[in-house]
Amino acid sequence: MAMPSPVVVPASGKHSATVIMLHGLGDQGSSWAPVASQMGLSHCKFIFPSAATRPVSINMGAPCPAWADIKGLSPDSPDDEEGAKQAIEYVHKLIADEVAAGIPPSRVVVGGFSQGAAISCLSAMTHKEALGGCFLLSGWLMMRQKVPSMLSPSFLSDKVPVLHCHGTNDMIVPFLFGQVSSQAMEQMGANIDFKPYPGMAHESSPQELSDLQAFLKKCIPEAPPAPIPSDPSGLSVKELKGILKERGVDSSDCFEKSDLLAKVKSLL
């Protein structure tokens, strides 16, 4: 199934980490794009994929954007395993693209809202190499009975951090379903932090986004800048400007390479 192009928000600073966030049922990636600026992580690139449109059972069979079919939203509801596996493969491909571009798996965090959270969780748990983290906002664990046999050994051995946020007044994905999912992951050995939000419905909140920001800062902190060569005179103008930018040093008053070089040498 052809997937729409994701919304990509480039890092505003030196790119050293990537966050992939999946939307919920009936939504699209652009709806969550403002989260990128709200997180205030200049070193992070954010990718907001959009699901293809398909018939959805819980939507009376009407087509809408969905990562897989949803037959129900209770702990006993059957899952669309084939649809979920296709979505996981897509997320793994997005991760592979980031790795090919030079971002290690340990610097990639996946997460999402509602059904997007469910898919991103499985994507992190089954990825061959340990990711930097995973977050679920109002989500749940799909295929609970089969996940133990699908788990990547590195997910447990590297203690990949998982943040699971859920509102107590969620009437779409019931709070109890979130609790059951979190407990199931914990029993599997997952390094999970379950956070309840009193009074919150099937939505996000400023406090939840603040908690997500703190989680991302902990999982994928800004990488320290590369060391400055002892003799930077052989560097190009672009490289000298890059060194200054990484360290927050203004170079707008540098009109010659010698000016840049003098500023860089002052940092040694």
Regions found by a protein language model. Name each.
Residues 2-107:
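Serine-hydrolase catalytic machinery in alpha/beta-hydrolase-like enzymes
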Residues 9-12, 139-222:
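The feature captures the conserved acid-bearing segment of alpha/beta-hydrolase catalytic domains
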Residues 16, 23-26, 78-85, 203-206, ...:
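Intrinsic disorder
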Residues 22-24, 112, 138, 166-167:
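The conserved beta1-alpha1 loop
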Residues 31, 90, 119, 177-180, ...:
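Acidic, Ser/Thr-rich intrinsically disordered and amphipathic helical segments
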Residues 99-157:
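Primarily recognizes the serine-hydrolase "nucleophile elbow" in alpha/beta-hydrolase
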Residues 225-268:
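Basic helix-extension-helix modules of the SAP/HeH family
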